[in-house]
Design a protein with these regions (language model features):
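Glycine-rich phosphate-binding loops that contact phosphosugars or nucleotide phosphates
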Residues: 126-134, 140-287
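Extended, charge-enriched "interface" segments that sit outside catalytic cores
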Residues: 2-140
């Protein structure tokens, strides 16, 4: 059932296939036809266009055959049903449930996982709306103007990429309420550069660590906490945690609020969980 790609006969065919020259592929009328054909309609009037990728009909056919050899659709169906797909760590893979449900209910330890993720999204929505409309203010009584996410790896890269991708849209449509910033480097000069450019009295911080023990993230938290205290501010009044329910950060009075994720959502896929949902909802609104 599970076979490495380089063990598949069709993978060798792919390696031997000729890579198309995009400069030639996109020229003239044939290029215009390629742009039209290599486009897939998606939701909200958007399209995924792959005309500028180094593929052609021959490569697409080989990729389809490789997907068939690997039983890709069957494996995807098993992922949707909550079977153990992460064989290395013996875990389910459930990031898709933060976006929608295409399969049957996934129950773990008596808990409906889709319901759990929706509950966390509701908490994030309510909190972000309260921050954005001024119901929850900074300790000074002023509205929060900025949000800083403290994380590393998937807790940083995905949310950061989505924020940068949406920033211009948010500004153009008057959706950007809190400017977002990110601290991941354990070099204190990096964090100091971010913090020195902000009005700390109106800045909210999000600490992201699934285990609650990530050394690099906790090191940055301590640095930020010291920075705030030196400015006469109380970190507990300006910091929220995104973590697991069993983490030492959960329901900790050192944080203004806590939002939860779990081991079934890997870091690189966590942008639509509370990991990315909190900072993006604060910046652009929950919708």
């Amino acid at each position: 059932m599970w076979k490495n790609l380089d063990e598949c006969s069709l993978f060798r065919d792919l390696q031997e296939a000729q890579i198309p020259d995009l400069r030639q592929c996109l020229k003239g009328e044939s290029g215009a036809n390629r742009i039209e054909r290599y486009s897939i309609p998606m939701a909200a009037g958007m399209h995924y266009n792959y005309a500028a990728k180094q593929v052609d009909d021959t490569l697409l056919s080989l990729l389809q055959k490789l997907a068939d050899e690997q039983q890709l659709i069957l494996k995807y169906q098993r992922l949707l049903s909550g079977e153990e797909i992460n064989t290395g760590e013996h875990r389910k893979v459930l990031h898709h449930l933060t976006r929608g449900q295409l399969g049957d209910d996934v129950i773990y330890n008596g808990k409906n996982m889709r319901t759990f993720y929706l509950e966390q999204q509701k908490k994030v929505r309510e909190f972000s709306e309260a921050i954005r409309n001024g119901s929850i203010t900074a300790p000074s009584g002023k509205p929060f103007t900025d949000v800083v996410q403290i994380g590393i790896g998937g807790s940083d890269l995905g949310p950061r990429a989505l924020y940068l991708a949406l920033k211009a849209w948010g500004e153009r449509h008057n959706k950007l309420k809190l400017r977002a910033h990110f601290i991941s480097n354990v070099d204190p000069d990096d964090a100091a550069a971010v913090l020195s450019a902000l009005d700390l009295s109106t800045t909210l911080f999000i600490l992201v660590s699934k285990s609650g023990t990530t050394l690099e993230t906790l090191t940055n938290e301590r640095f930020v906490g010291q920075f705030l205290q030196e400015a006469g501010l109380n970190p507990a009044k300006q910091m929220v945690a995104v973590t697991s329910e069993s983490s030492p950060l959960a329901n900790n009075p050192s944080y203004l609020a806590s939002f939860y994720m779990d081991d079934f959502i890997g870091g690189r896929y966590s942008s639509t969980s509370a990991c990315g949902g909190a900072v993006l909802s604060l910046a652009f609104g929950a919708d």
